[in-house]
Amino acid sequence: MQITEQSSLYDDLEKKPVREILEDINREDQKVALAVQKAIPQIEQLVNLIVPRMKQGGRIFYMGAGTSGRLGVLDASEIPPTFGMPPTWIIGLIAGGDTALRNPVEGAEDDMNRGWEELTGYHINDKDTVIGIAASGTTPYVIAVSYTHLTLPTTPYV
């Protein structure tokens, strides 16, 4: 079993000077831009795959647990007001449902079957794209996205 919550720069925060904490956070934030820069070729491929599907009525599904799931739901909820798209085009699913947006739902991320059931409840089709979001890459609820490829081989999943 992989542990996602482990020792980090943020252990013993109460013992660190504020300046050190802020510098640590800033250093970590800088890693994000570099990671995105390295992934631009893969991101471009994904966008080029998704856009034609959406033009044919396809949807994007984000599936995540914990903070990763919350960020997927947040992103999906920002699409309608920001870009004027219908809320049914990009859908965020989080292990534990809406309750998990504000409160931890322990164990929900370990239920792969539940992830698959929630996804199939939307009647996914070959125009849809399913994107799993997991910091560890091993969250069972999120791994359910791989079932889409077995059931609908032309439906991309990430």
Language-model region placement:
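A short, well-structured juxtamembrane/interface segment
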Residues: K38-P52
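Conserved small/polar residues in nucleotide/adenosyl-binding loops
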Residues: T148-T154
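Cofactor-/ligand-binding subdomain signature composed of acidic, glycine-rich
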Residues: M1-A35
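Active-site cofactor/substrate anionic-group-binding motifs, chiefly glycine-
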Residues: V51, Q56-D98
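Glycine-rich oxoanion-binding loops at beta->alpha junctions
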Residues: P80, G84-V130
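A short, small-residue-rich loop immediately preceding and capping a beta-strand
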Residues: G58-T67, D126-T138
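Short glycine/serine/threonine-rich phosphate/pyrophosphate-binding segments
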Residues: S68-L74, S136-A144
